[in-house]
Amino acid sequence: MQSLAAEQFLPRVDRKFDRDNLHNVSENEKHILIMNGWFCHNPVDCFPPSDSIVPVFVGFHLYGEKTQDLLTPQCIEYFKKHGPIGCRDRRTMELLAEKGIDSFYSKCLTITFPKRTKEPVNGKVFIVDADTIPIPQSLYEGAIHVTHSVEDLFGDEVKAALAKKLLELYRDEGSLVITTRLHCALPCISVGLPVIFFGDSSDSRISLLKDLNVQINRMPNKYLRGIYRFVNEVPRNREWGKRFRKVCVPVFMRYVDWNPSPIDIKQEKEHLIDATRDLIAQKISLSESIKS
């Protein structure tokens, strides 16, 4: 989803690079690369990227035990040289600012997908990587269950095609999305879908949802999830699962708004689109001046 969002801002895509091997890229020509996302899978071979890369930092994210691998003196110097750094969350912005790096809170590029022009007739409920969440029977019945987890045996082109098809499916046929996935929630909000999100509101990875006025519903406790899994996944218990969803879910999950309205993020979307276009234009201008 993040790559699809980035490609919207480019006139064309000449090359694609392995996110985890940017340090070792060796090209005769320089390539502008939108650096949105998390780059700590393999920081040694990723950062700092090679001189063949002209980075546009927007939606950049730091999180986890490998964060310090991207805050070495060499990396800090790289960030200062190629700033400003647009950050997906306030915590990343603060970490960079503490190092004297020019940074700003951009949010994520996946909020820039165009809003759909019409809502579907008899739209579908999509439950995305939320099968352990107890859901009311009225929503569960007829819902489509989806996962964003894709086996590594599929190549990047297949994964990109699947992501595009999923986004089109949500946009064209969805009436509601229930998910635990940030990069399902944000694109769906962007295209105009109502979203019910479950997660940890204290987690900086998803903190931008609060700034978009998205309710972050706490995950049900492990005992409730265990009971739900037992009555929901074992075939002989399915009738009990239906009763559980009808009777118990409205009681135990009453803190959830099961009928949310779409959230208007027009202002945030336009601001990020303008900022991203400006950053790209600056990099293009800089690259052309270096050539001349």
Task: List the model feature ranges, each with a label.
Residues 1-292:
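Active-site anion-handling motifs in enzyme catalytic cores
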